[in-house]
């Protein structure tokens, strides 16, 4: 019996990923196993057996990685565990980086040495943009300072041998299974299920195999600026050519030619039944030949072209152009994800993609504010008429007659309860349309099951995901690879900053000592009120007030972020500054934001977590964070993005934007702060620790006396546990707000004077260890 219990527990642990998702409250629908949509090779890892580890945990690769004679001229170290290290000071860094971004996931990219990791998904992405198995292995051998380990070669072959060899192409509204490898087509046709999916003529005979030769050329033309190589990469030193081995030099020249030349490709294809597409995809995955979806939009004569083009004023930056060339590399549209920093112009990439495809386009954002901003971006960068844009939110439901671009939110499409009559009509219209392109903004925020629902409601030939932070605190991010497509491009934040495309930001963590009275209560209290105590720390308030005064004297525009509404109101009201949070009406929000943008007297605004992703404030150049959402790396990066937009007319200084995170010393907040910074540190940012703000004693600041601090403490202690809760943003997925909380009250409250009831808790009973707890509920016991 004990063995069976142990086996059950092991099985539950292996499935834990599908249950424990912090950002998804929905129950698993029967038959929706995510593993059905993932080839078995995707779960493979690089074999590390045989690697020696010293007493400090460092790996000793000296025997496995003998150096080449000309190793100083080659930029890569390829470790047996799949990690690749790139010397950013190498004269051939430009080419090596472009290659690594295509085949591996960036792990950490500081100034001098960058770290990447080979994964099954990154290799799938490499194959999807046209790289062959032999290309990847040959390039790695040429670039590596040492011999490439056999385990790495086997891993690359395992992950790329079958992926990308078969494509599902839509031409003239007919579906074809296409491949450059005739033997693969013959292998698939031997399977009875695939033979059943093949289209038959009126006599019941299978249609003939179609052999075609076509010339593939990118749908995005190369500009003069980017034709000499991406400006976001370092230029090769002409003096350094003599240091480059001849095989590398010849190879780089060939790479440049291959990118510029048109390529002739011979393909073999057969037509399949449209109603059996889903069954065909599942069967191909089972046979380890997952179908890569491509949309031949130029030859789609069934769906009408829409009247949309880029305005002459819309000039693409080199990295934007490069990301789109990955999407439209062979004259067709590939589905996938493009990762660009906040403020680097993701919207222009989306608008350009819509102008290239020129078919009906559906844009999905995560809030009503982002819907309005997408509409403004389409009008700013493209020639589309206002009447052709249709919004579908709870507040704005434009009539879809003659609509070419529809903009909505994930929650509107994924809504399962009863809708109004008007909303039902718009939903019916959305379902019946055949969309050429679907743009998914902030694609990392929505869990896999929500995507499945949205993707089954509307049909689109091509899906483009846009995000700045391809990270989640759970491991659901990998599901995007097969729900949308592989990662097509990821920009290097530091290079964009050095080239002036995004602001140069000074990141600082300001340590604020806890006042003795506040710290005494912090140690004694075990409830959520501890959060209020370290957020309302008087020394943190004084530091915030000092930084606001300092930057206002420089005529800077300042945003102060607070996840806690109690703290947000206290800070803003005491400092006499406007604030925006969930219940603030749309009209008041727009009024505050317009004043912040154009009124020289309004230089500081306070915003709750509603401003993390939806507010576009290019004027802001200082951000102060007084409270945050635990250790969320994503939120830290999104907030930094509020001040990342390139600054116009700023004084030429080393830094032109500032990001301050105020942290109460010796509290849980310090551990959270370290976790939050991991993503930005991996992008190459460094956080300066400030323990004392120079000139703070000379300023006239609030809470300078013990009496004032004591009054503030009493106010915090009188607050309820509900006040310590973070704000729950309407329409936010996975928000779990507790329906009840334990709090102190007066005797009149307990007798029903303010609609509360008296309850008792048995602490010993709640602390009793529970047996055989299902993994789904374990996190509630933490």
Swiss-Prot record:
Entry GO MF terms: 3'-5' DNA helicase activity; ATP binding; ATP hydrolysis activity; damaged DNA binding; DNA binding; promoter-specific chromatin binding
Superkingdom of this protein's organism: Eukaryota
Signal peptide: none
Motif (Nuclear localization signal): 6-18
Keyword Ribosomal protein part of the UniProt annotation: no
Record's catalysed reaction(s): Couples ATP hydrolysis with the unwinding of duplex DNA by translocating in the 3'-5' direction; ATP + H2O = ADP + phosphate + H(+)
Main subcellular location: nucleus
GO cellular component, one term: nucleotide-excision repair factor 3 complex
Subcellular location: Nucleus
Domain Helicase ATP-binding: 327-488
Region Disordered, annotated ranges: 1-51, 218-241
E.C. designation(s): 5.6.2.4
Mutagenesis / variant outcome for changing residue 469 to A: Very low 3'-5' helicase activity, wild-type ATPase activity, opens damaged DNA, nearly wild-type NER activity in vivo, 50% decreased transcription in vitro
Impact upon substituting residue 751 to E: Does not restore NER in XPB/ERCC3-defective cells, inhibits 5'-incision by ERCC1-XPF, wild-type transcription and helicase activities
Modified residues (Phosphoserine): 686, 751
Disease: Xeroderma pigmentosum complementation group B: An autosomal recessive pigmentary skin disorder characterized by solar hypersensitivity of the skin, high predisposition for developing cancers on areas exposed to sunlight and, in some cases, neurological abnormalities. The skin develops marked freckling and other pigmentation abnormalities. Some XP-B patients present features of Cockayne syndrome, including cachectic dwarfism, pigmentary retinopathy, ataxia, decreased nerve conduction velocities.
Function, as annotated: ATP-dependent 3'-5' DNA helicase/translocase. Binds dsDNA rather than ssDNA, unzipping it in a translocase rather than classical helicase activity. Component of the general transcription and DNA repair factor IIH (TFIIH) core complex. When complexed to CDK-activating kinase (CAK), involved in RNA transcription by RNA polymerase II. The ATPase activity of XPB/ERCC3, but not its helicase activity, is required for DNA opening; it may wrap around the damaged DNA wedging it open, causing localized melting that allows XPD/ERCC2 helicase to anchor.
Family to which this protein belongs: Belongs to the helicase family. RAD25/XPB subfamily.
Assembly behavior: Component of the 7-subunit TFIIH core complex composed of XPB/ERCC3, XPD/ERCC2, GTF2H1, GTF2H2, GTF2H3, GTF2H4 and GTF2H5, which is active in NER. The core complex associates with the 3-subunit CDK-activating kinase (CAK) module composed of CCNH/cyclin H, CDK7 and MNAT1 to form the 10-subunit holoenzyme (holo-TFIIH) active in transcription. Interacts with PUF60. Interacts with ATF7IP. Interacts with KAT2A; leading to KAT2A recruitment to promoters and acetylation of histones. (Microbial infection) Interacts with Epstein-Barr virus EBNA2.
Protein name in UniProt: General transcription and DNA repair factor IIH helicase/translocase subunit XPB
Species this protein is from: Homo sapiens
């Amino acid at each position: 019996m004990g063995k069976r219990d142990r086996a059950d527990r092991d099985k539950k642990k292996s499935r834990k990923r599908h249950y424990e998702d912090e950002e998804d409250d929905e129950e698993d629908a029967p038959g929706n196993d995510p593993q059905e949509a993932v080839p078995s090779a995707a779960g493979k890892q690089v074999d590390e057996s045989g690697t020696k580890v010293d007493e400090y945990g460092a790996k000793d690769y000296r025997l496995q990685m003998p150096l080449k004679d000309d190793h100083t001229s080659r930029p890569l170290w390829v470790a047996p565990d799949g990690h690749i290290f790139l010397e950013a000071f190498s004269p051939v860094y430009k080419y090596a980086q472009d290659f690594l971004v295509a085949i591996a996931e960036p792990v950490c990219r500081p100034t001098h040495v960058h770290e990447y990791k080979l994964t099954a998904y990154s290799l799938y992405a490499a194959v999807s943009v046209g790289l062959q198995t032999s290309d990847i292995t040959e390039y790695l051998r040429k670039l590596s300072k040492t011999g490439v380990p056999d385990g790495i070669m086997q891993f690359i072959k395992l992950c790329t041998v079958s992926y990308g060899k078969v494509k599902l192409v839509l031409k003239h509204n007919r579906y074809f299974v296409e491949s450059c490898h005739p033997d693969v087509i013959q292998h698939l046709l031997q399977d009875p299920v695939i033979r059943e999916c093949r289209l038959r003529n009126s006599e019941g005979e299978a249609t003939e195999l179609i052999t075609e030769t076509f010339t593939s050329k990118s749908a995005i033309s190369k500009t003069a600026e980017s034709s000499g190589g991406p400006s976001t990469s370092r230029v090769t030193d002409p003096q350094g050519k003599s240091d480059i081995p001849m095989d590398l030099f010849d190879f780089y020249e060939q790479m440049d030619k291959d990118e510029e030349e048109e390529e002739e490709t011979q393909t073999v294809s057969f037509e399949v039944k449209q109603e059996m597409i889903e069954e065909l995809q599942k069967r191909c995955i089972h046979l380890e030949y997952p179908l890569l979806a491509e949309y031949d939009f130029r030859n789609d004569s069934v769906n009408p072209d829409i009247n949309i083009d880029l305005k002459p004023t819309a000039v693409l930056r080199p990295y934007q152009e490069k990301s789109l060339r990955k999407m439209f590399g062979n004259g067709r549209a590939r589905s996938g994800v493009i990762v660009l920093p906040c403020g680097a112009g993701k919207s222009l990439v989306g608008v350009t993609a819509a102008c290239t495809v020129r078919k009906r386009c559906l844009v999905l954002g995560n809030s009503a504010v982002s819907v309005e901003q997408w509409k403004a971006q389409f009008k700013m960068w493209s020639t589309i008429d206002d009447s052709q844009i249709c919004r579908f939110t709870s507040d704005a439901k434009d009539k879809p007659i003659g609509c070419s671009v529809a903009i909505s939110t994930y929650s509107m499409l994924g809504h399962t309860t009863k809708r109004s009559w008007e909303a039902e009509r718009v939903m019916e219209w959305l379902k019946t349309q055949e969309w050429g392109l679907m743009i998914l903004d902030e694609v990392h925020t929505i869990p896999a099951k929500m995507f499945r629902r949205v993707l089954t409601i509307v049909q689109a030939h091509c899906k483009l995901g846009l995000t700045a932070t391809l990270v989640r605190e759970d491991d659901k991010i990998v599901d995007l690879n097969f729900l949308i497509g592989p990662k097509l491009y990821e920009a290097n934040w530091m290079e964009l900053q050095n080239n002036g495309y995004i602001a140069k930001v000074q990141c600082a963590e300001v340590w604020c000592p806890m006042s003795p009275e506040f710290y005494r209560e912090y140690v004694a209290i075990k409830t959520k009120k501890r959060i209020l105590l370290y957020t309302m720390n008087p020394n943190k308030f004084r530091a915030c007030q000092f930084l606001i005064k300092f930057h206002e004297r420089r005529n800077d525009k300042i945003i102060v972020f607070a996840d806690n509404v109690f703290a947000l109101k206290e800070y803003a009201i005491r400092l006499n500054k406007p604030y925006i949070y969930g219940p603030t009406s749309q009209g008041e929000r727009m009024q505050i934001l317009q004043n912040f943008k154009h009124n020289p007297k309004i230089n500081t605004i306070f915003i709750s977590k509603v401003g993390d992703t939806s507010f576009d404030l290019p004027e802001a150049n200082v951000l102060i964070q007084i409270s945050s959402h635990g250790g969320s790396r994503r939120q830290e990066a999104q907030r930094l993005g509020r001040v990342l937009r390139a600054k116009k007319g700023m004084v030429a200084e080393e830094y032109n934007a500032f990001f301050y995170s105020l942290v109460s010393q010796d509290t849980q907040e310090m551990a959270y702060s370290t976790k939050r910074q991991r993503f930005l540190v991996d992008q190459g940012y460094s956080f300066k620790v400030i323990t004392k703000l120079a000139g703070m004693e000379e300023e006239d600041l609030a809470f300078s006396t013990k009496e004032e601090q004591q009054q503030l403490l009493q106010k915090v202690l009188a607050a309820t546990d509900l006040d310590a809760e973070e704000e729950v943003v309407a329409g936010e997925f996975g928000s779990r707000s507790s329906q009840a909380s334990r709090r102190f009250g007066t005797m009149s409250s307990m007798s029903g004077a303010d609609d509360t009831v008296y309850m008792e808790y048995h602490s010993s009973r709640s602390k009793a260890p529970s047996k055989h707890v299902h993994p789904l509920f374990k996190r509630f016991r933490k």
